[in-house]
């Protein structure tokens, strides 16, 4: 709709060299081409988390449940660049359970409380829960049924306190990078 048009126009106005969120179409295109750019903070945080915990990505089957422009789509590119075999599931995907059961890494980012159940996950999988859902009782839960799924995983992120802090950390990292680049450019201009 019209709101999407305005959103696209607004994103184009952000200088891609200062786009710390990684949403400008230039950065989105550069990410798709495997070029150096700012990456959307949540996918960037997920990759950093996997790397920090030395969770193998290369050659692994990774499934992303969700195809948003903020998480799902950029994460596809990030995982592909690390040589994962990437499958994307969404609201029209048939037999999601069959796909998730065969996945080494599962990223749940669809906005449905406790969607991913224990019977949908193979033993030893890594599960990243991006969801933030407020229940009627006020409790915040993710897209993963943590109680069930955590019994089968080798690694799982909690909600709250898992991906959210990593997103903020990557935003701060991008801000420092822009600031440093800006300062370096001005230092060289003076001489």
Language model segments and positions:
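Anion-binding alpha/beta catalytic cores of soluble intermediary-metabolism enzymes, centered on
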Residues: 4-57
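Glycine-rich phosphate/diphosphate-binding loop of Rossmann-like nucleotide-binding domains
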Residues: 40-115
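General beta-strand structural signal in soluble alpha/beta enzymes
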Residues: 22-25, 40, 88-89, 156-159
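Conserved adenylation A10 loop of the ANL superfamily
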Residues: 181
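Short, small-residue-biased leader/transition segments that mark boundaries at the very start
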Residues: 1-6, 185-188
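Cationic, low-complexity basic patches in intrinsically disordered or flexible, solvent-exposed regions
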Residues: 191
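Alpha-helical scaffold segments in soluble metabolic enzymes
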Residues: 9, 13, 45-52, 74, ...
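Rossmann-like adenosine-cofactor binding region
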Residues: 90-177
């Amino acid at each position: 709709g019209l709101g999407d048009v305005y959103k696209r126009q607004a994103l184009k106005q952000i200088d891609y060299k200062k786009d710390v969120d990684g949403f400008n179409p230039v950065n989105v295109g550069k990410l798709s081409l495997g070029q150096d750019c700012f990456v959307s903070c949540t996918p960037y945080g997920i990759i950093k988390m996997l790397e920090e915990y030395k969770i193998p990505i290369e050659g692994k089957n990774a499934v992303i449940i969700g195809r948003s422009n903020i998480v799902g789509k950029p994460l596809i590119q990030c995982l592909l660049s690390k040589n994962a075999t990437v499958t994307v599931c969404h609201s029209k995907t048939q037999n999601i359970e069959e796909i998730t059961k065969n996945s080494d890494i599962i990223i749940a980012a669809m906005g449905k409380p406790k969607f991913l159940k224990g019977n949908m996950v193979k033993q030893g999988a890594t599960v990243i829960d991006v969801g933030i859902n407020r229940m009627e009782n006020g409790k915040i839960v993710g897209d993963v049924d943590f109680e069930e799924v955590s019994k089968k995983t080798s690694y799982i992120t909690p909600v709250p306190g898992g991906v959210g802090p990593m997103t903020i950390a990557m935003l701060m990292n991008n801000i420092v990078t822009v600031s440093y680049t800006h300062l370096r450019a001005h230092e060289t201009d003076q001489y």
